[in-house]
Amino acid sequence: MALIQTAFIWVAYAVAVGIVALIAAIFTYTYQTPRDRSALVSTVTIITLTSLLATVLLLPVDIALVSSTTSKLGAKKDWATPETVHNILLTLKIVYYALYSFDAVLCLLVIPFTYFFYEEYDEIDSEEGTQTFGQRFLSAAKYTLFFVALVVILFLVGFFVPVAKNRGSDMDLDYFKRLLAENHGERALTFALGLLISLGTLLYILYTSVGLALLPISFIKSAPSISAPQLSETTASALEQNRERQRQLEGRNAGRDGGLSAKDQRELEALHREERTLVRRERLAAESRGDGKSFIVRAWTKTCAIFRPLKLIGGILLLILSLIIWVSMLITGIDKAKNSFCKQHCGYILGSINIFQPINWIFVKSSIVFPIDYVLMALLVLFLFSSSVTGIAAIGLRFLWVKLFEIRKGHTSPQALLMATVMLTLIILAINYSIAMLIAPQYAIYGAQTFCANPTKFPGDQPDCSNHPELIKTCSELSSGEGAEKVCTPSVVSTFLNRVTVNFPFFGALAFWAQFVFLAIFLIVFVTALFRTPKLDLSEIDEDAEADEEEGLLASTGRRFGATWQDIRGKTQNTSGGAAGRGIRGDDDHNDD
């Protein structure tokens, strides 16, 4: 029975990794620009994102495996011998160390090498045969040596840096003694992870907080809708007026010596530019309607239009989830700041939950029946990941106030994609800390484990609480006694993260207090976004259409226009003002605004 249960847990994890690999591939191909697509960049991005998400999604597996060793009566199951439990923990440690090490190598070595390898490519030299693969490889490797030196220095510092020592009676518990790392190799990896988490926390409080506020609101308050039929009609009307005005100018100056006057010439040139814009916009509207496409494509377009109103409901649900996450983090933060017995000396580890925390309660209750908690954790991780992507897309890749790259669907360069992947690597490490330490702290450490506090008659016997349910206690860091020591098994990830904060208290204090900055930024952006009306940027649409037209890719990246009944019917509504009254401005008029 134990073997079947363990196998089921690992199979569920394998399925989850397969799903996140698909999500990583969709993310990569959705955001990268088609005309500069690189197979190497795409592969590295997909592998990196899959590895990162797999690292975070190992938490429910960790909880399920350690929780499976205990019964509802607070005793170890018959098959859960000390040797069996040790083997389970050893397997989890190997997987964790492998994933964390792989993440670090990808972030600090593989992605920089891929960035320089792509930058070294010269299309003209490659076609002429003056640039070979070996030259590009050696040149990229030369620039990557800096990052190799950085990794070596990082691990050397972690290998020799002194760790925190026992700090009095507060740290005398067995749980905290085990956290004080004595192995130098483990200490080096702990230091490196703590440094990467700290760097990721700085990005996390900026990008994830903004995305967590903007993502639900973007579903609810989308930009003003323009239906494809309405856009087509207004564009056709404006195009007709444009060409009529051109004919008037040409007719008025037909018999004039020297041709058009300077004023008329400038107006005619502006009309020509506007005409090109309107023609592109007309073709774009036709693409969004599915004109010239198969019946399946047209049916899919109308089906999407029908279900777009569900976007509002989804936005409301995501908004509720965002607020619950915010409240849960605030509750845990206050609880830790007030009730942590070791404060900044151990990264504000909380002995036990003192205030009801909704998300932690949901996960603890759902962990009783696997894989309910796994599904919930996967959804939570993907939501925070999507929020991070939304934040990066909204703010862009910046150095101080200078925007270096822009992250947009279908318009992200390979360099920007690699830099965004590095940022997401660090952010996901910070998300892993936030989930385990603030969002669901009790669940992340012991899950639903309990222990029987009823004393045993003989040493080595299992405690029996079948007739004393009131003596069944919840496992926590402060649990003591023979029953807790034999039954309560902390998760590997919580032990690893707590080892970072206990051995290097600076990292723990930074990661903890940064959560309050995260909450403050979320609140500011959330309130601002509630009262800010989104605008439809037609100039951006025109620029996208022009770029796509130049590359012959207009059909593959047509933009979606709002969800209205007109999209479903394929016809425009009759309005008193008409298209001519509203019109559509060209590039020059738009820029004048």
Curated annotation (Swiss-Prot):
This is Probable lysosomal cobalamin transporter. GO terms for cellular component: vacuolar membrane. It comes from Botryotinia fuckeliana (strain B05.10) (Noble rot fungus). Residues 241-255, 584-593 have a biased composition (Basic and acidic residues). The keyword Disulfide bond does not apply. Probable lysosomal cobalamin transporter. Required to export cobalamin from lysosomes allowing its conversion to cofactors. Keywords: Cobalamin, Cobalt, Glycoprotein, Lysosome, Membrane, Transmembrane, Transmembrane helix, Transport. The chain crosses the membrane at residues 7-27, 46-66, 94-114, 144-164, 195-215, 312-332, 349-369, 375-395, 419-439, 506-526. Glycans are attached at N574. One of its GO terms (molecular function) is cobalamin binding. The keyword Transport applies.
